[in-house]
């Protein structure tokens, strides 16, 4: 049996061993002479110590921190020690022969506080485990190598001004990465480095508090406090860190408003209307926001009735405005007091009040030219209708309030009385009618009267005058509408045919009740019964007569009850018709069959159809004629004969390409008569002609014809020759024939009767000319 002892030894130079631990372990052993294995209880010779490695320790060589040893190791070199686990082979190495464990670099507890490893002894030759692996821990022992830090710094805090001593402002917290369970490396103490005597800090909790009372924001609004955290309980040698706390004092309403001056003086012209700004007052309040809001008011007195004051929402100014019209002649100055008060008052600071202030205000009224003032804002007048022109309607009056007063002149603005129904006296404002008024045409007349100062036409004012036309009984009653009624021939006696209504254009209440009466007597075909409400019922007294061509005309008399009473007569038309069983009209003989001209409906339709057909034919014919005329006119407009130039001539001069005026060709009858004076020659481009067939009778006739055409061309060059041969005095440069002057007219100087050489030699272009001048017969075809 092999007994194993595991020893963890501490290095004498400062590495600590925490104790020895012995534990029995079972071991298997074989005995000669026994048939099976025998279980023996042997002593497990392990001594277990926990390792501690000081962090940040470093040396020139790896540091021995412990040793592994087994009692099976006889020192013969047959045992090999193995180390596995966290950091084995890199941070920790083991000597396989001796079991010494070394650390190869300095360790940081804040990165890793402990390492768990496995140790095992094996046979060097066969690598057979001599014992099971055993786990042990190497702890990194902390040292004070980390200063406190404030992870949330720098801090910003707010505390109300005028806070009591000890008011909590903010809590700061520092963090120390060292081991809080080992020594005082992580025990922190807070102190104030800068910010005394205004603030203090709790050494243990880091709560910052106010240290003095009545800190005023208006004196100092912001404070910078420096807080330090020191480990090792604040003792010497400890590490420290600091942060800043910016403390801002928030505003409270601890200051009343104050007027910078006790008396304000303003001036305003008397013509300033209500709402006109007189001046601004400013009560100063050093507080902020809602705590600085100020409300202004006028204390009881003479000023509160004439002036008003409000607060400007932007600048917190007091806006003094006019409330009622001012009059320099009545009062020239006002003196009153204005109070400024905080709108929000904190009861906690009433001891610093009162939160209001008072100032005096004096307003001087300045004189200004004023327009005339009417005695009333509007005037309402009345005049009866049908009165003669010049009837008095009423009078208006205006006065000049200035001193001295100026005379007033009155006039009616034309746009308010376009029909010139009224007139006004310019000096006293008396209004009279200019025409007879009719209430039924227009009830109200709205005039605009202009009052102007005689000394200053710029000073004027206007007033509205409403004139009502009063009613008189001047309209006779009449029927509300024309009545054209039909009644069935089968109607029963006493049947109501129609309710006839009357209309009186006079005003209701002016005896406008209307009575109606129809024909009376035994011969009356219809009965009219007055309903005494402005209407009458038309009744059938007996069975109606058979239908007839002419309708019944019933006279109706209408009268009112005015003074004097007015009456009129109207006619109601009643036709007797045949009706269907449902009561609707079927026909009224003969009006239903004939038109007013005596023609039937079918005849009228036939006549209208024929007239429409004839009218359509006429329109179609005119349209076709217009279309044909337009087509001819288009061809005439597009006549381009004057632009056609023949280029197959023998000449080459520019004068040969000039076209003649086409106007005379288009209108030969309108050609101008031959002009007086010397003959003017006009050369035009010759055109190629085909040989004439048959041949002219003789050369003498042709010569006579050419002479006639030549004379016409010489006397009237504006008329182009249609059928004549043009004679050129010069063929143009570059021609193989030279000049053709020998063919010039007889009127030219030096002209000869014929060409000097045979024309047949000149080619086919001159064949016609050769035939005209030649004596021989043309060649046979």
Swiss-Prot record:
Gene3D superfamilies: Cadherins, TCF3-CBD (Catenin binding domain)
SMART domains named in the record: CA
Subcellular location: Cell membrane
Residues spanning the signal sequence: 1-22
Keyword tags: Calcium, Cell adhesion, Cell membrane, Cleavage on pair of basic residues, Glycoprotein, Membrane, Metal-binding, Repeat, Signal, Transmembrane, Transmembrane helix
Regions that span the bilayer: 604-624
CDD domains, per the entry: Cadherin_repeat
Name used for this protein in its record: Cadherin-24
Protein's UniProt keywords contain Cytoplasm: no
Propeptide: 23-44
SUPFAM superfamilies the UniProt entry points to: Cadherin-like
Quaternary structure note: Associates with alpha-, beta- and delta-catenins.
Extracellular topological segments: 45-603
Its job: Cadherins are calcium-dependent cell adhesion proteins. They preferentially interact with themselves in a homophilic manner in connecting cells; cadherins may thus contribute to the sorting of heterogeneous cell types. Cadherin-24 mediate strong cell-cell adhesion.
Residue ranges annotated for the Cadherin domain, each copy included: 46-150, 151-259, 260-374, 375-479, 479-592
Pfam families reported for this sequence: CADH_Y-type_LIR (PF01049), Cadherin (PF00028)
Cytoplasmic-facing ranges: 625-781
A GO CC term attached to the entry: cell-cell junction
Region (Disordered): 665-700, 731-762
Keyword Membrane among UniProt keywords: yes
Glycan-carrying positions: 446, 510, 525
Domain topic, free-text comment: Three calcium ions are usually bound at the interface of each cadherin domain and rigidify the connections, imparting a strong curvature to the full-length ectodomain.
Record-level GO BP terms: cell-cell adhesion; homophilic cell adhesion via plasma membrane adhesion molecules
Membrane topology according to the record: Single-pass type I membrane protein
GO molecular function terms noted in the UniProt entry: calcium ion binding
Biased composition (Low complexity): 733-746
């Amino acid at each position: 049996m092999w007994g194993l002892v595991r020893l963890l030894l501490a290095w004498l130079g400062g590495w600590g061993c925490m104790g020895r631990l012995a534990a029995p372990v079972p071991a298997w052993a074989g005995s000669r002479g026994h048939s099976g294995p025998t279980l023996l209880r042997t002593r497990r010779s392990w001594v277990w110590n926990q390792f501690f490695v000081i962090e940040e320790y470093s040396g020139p060589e790896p540091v021995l921190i412990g040793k592994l040893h087994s009692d099976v190791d006889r020192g013969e070199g047959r045992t090999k020690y193995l180390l596995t686990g966290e950091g084995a082979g890199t941070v920790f190495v083991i000597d396989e022969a001796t079991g010494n464990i070394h650390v190869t670099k300095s360790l940081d507890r804040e990165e890793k506080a402990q390492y768990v490893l496995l140790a095992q002894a094996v046979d060097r030759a066969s690598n057979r485990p001599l014992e099971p692996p055993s786990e042990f821990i190497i702890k990194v022992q902390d040292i004070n190598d980390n200063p406190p830090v404030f992870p949330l710094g720098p801090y910003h805090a707010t505390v109300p001004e005028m806070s009591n001593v000890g008011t909590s402002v903010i809590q700061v917290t520092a963090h120390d990465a060292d081991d809080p369970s080992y020594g005082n490396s992580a025990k922190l103490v807070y102190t104030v480095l800068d910010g005394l005597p205004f603030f203090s800090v709790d050494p243990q909790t880091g709560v910052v508090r106010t240290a003095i009372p009545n800190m005023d924001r208006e004196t100092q609004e912001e404070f910078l406090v420096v807080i330090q955290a020191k480990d090792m309980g604040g003792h010497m040698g400890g590490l420290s860190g600091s942060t800043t706390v910016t403390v801002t004092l928030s505003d409270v309403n601890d200051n009343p408003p104050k007027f910078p001056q006790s008396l304000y003086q303003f001036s305003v012209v008397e013509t300033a209307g209500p709402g006109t700004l007189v001046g601004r007052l400013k009560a100063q309040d050093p507080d902020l926001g809602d705590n600085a809001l100020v409300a202004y008011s006028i204390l009881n007195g003479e000023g509160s009735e004439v002036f008003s004051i409000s607060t400007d929402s932007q600048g917190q100014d007091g806006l003094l405005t006019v409330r009622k019209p001012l009059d320099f002649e009545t009062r020239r100055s006002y003196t009153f007091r204005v109070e400024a008060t905080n709108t929000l008052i904190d009861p906690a600071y009433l001891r610093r009040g009162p939160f209001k202030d008072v100032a005096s205000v004096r307003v001087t009224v300045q004189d200004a030219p004023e327009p005339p003032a009417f005695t009333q804002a509007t005037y309402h007048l009345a005049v009866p209708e049908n009165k003669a022109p010049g009837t008095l309607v009423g009078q208006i009056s205006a006065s000049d309030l200035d001193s001295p007063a100026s005379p007033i002149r009155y006039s009616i603005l034309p746009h308010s009385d376009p029909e010139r129904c009224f007139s006004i006296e310019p000096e006293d404002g008396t209004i009279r009618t200019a025409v007879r008024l009719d209430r039924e045409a227009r009830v109200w007349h709205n005039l605009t009267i202009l009052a102007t100062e005689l000394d200053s036409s710029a000073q004027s004012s206007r007033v509205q005058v409403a004139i009502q036309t009063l009613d008189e009984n001047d309209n006779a009653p009449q029927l509300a509408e024309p009545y054209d009624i039909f009644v069935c021939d089968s109607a029963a006696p006493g049947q109501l045919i129609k309710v006839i209504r009357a209309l009186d254009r006079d005003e209701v209440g002016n005896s406008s009740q209307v009575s109606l009466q129809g024909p009376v007597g035994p011969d009356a075909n219809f009965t009219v019964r007055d309903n005494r409400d402005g209407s009458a019922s038309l009744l059938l007294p007996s069975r109606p007569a058979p239908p007839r061509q002419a309708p019944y005309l019933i006279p109706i008399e209408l009268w009112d009850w005015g003074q004097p009473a007015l009456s009129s007569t109207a006619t109601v038309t009643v036709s007797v018709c045949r009706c269907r069983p449902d009561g609707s009209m079927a026909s009224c003989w003969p009006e239903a069959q004939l038109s007013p001209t005596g023609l039937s409906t079918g005849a009228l339709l036939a006549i209208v159809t024929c007239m429409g057909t004839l009218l359509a034919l006429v329109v179609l014919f005119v349209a076709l004629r217009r279309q044909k005329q337009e087509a001819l006119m288009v061809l005439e407009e597009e006549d381009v004969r004057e632009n056609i130039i023949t280029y197959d001539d023998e000449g080459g001069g520019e004068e040969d390409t000039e076209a003649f005026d086409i106007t005379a060709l288009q209108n030969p009858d309108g050609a101008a008569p031959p002009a007086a004076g010397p003959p003017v020659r006009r050369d035009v481009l010759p055109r190629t002609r085909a040989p004439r067939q048959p041949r002219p009778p003789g050369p003498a006739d042709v010569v006579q014809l050419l002479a006639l055409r030549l004379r016409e061309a010489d006397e009237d060059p504006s008329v182009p020759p249609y059928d004549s041969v043009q004679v050129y005095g010069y063929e143009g440069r570059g021609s193989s024939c030279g000049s053709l002057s020998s063919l010039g007219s007889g009127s030219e100087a030096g002209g000869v009767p014929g060409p000097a050489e045979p024309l047949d030699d000149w080619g086919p272009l001159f064949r016609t000319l050769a035939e005209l001048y030649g004596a021989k017969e043309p060649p046979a075809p």
